[in-house]
């Protein structure tokens, strides 16, 4: 499956990644060494994650992040 990240807010992207992983917020958090409240805050857009965190998540979930010109 593929998404065009430009069409989504950062909080929507993290939720999509978690849902693709078929993990609960708790399971996803444990896999990343975070707590459930952190995941919940990201998904609700209360807190933003860094690019480094996104790259770490992508690596752990076996996802590829690409950047290309239009």
Protein language model annotation of sequence segments:
Residues 10, 49-50:
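Residue-level preference for nonpolar/small residues embedded in alpha-helices
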Residues 33-48:
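Recognition helix of helix-turn-helix/homeodomain-like DNA-binding domains
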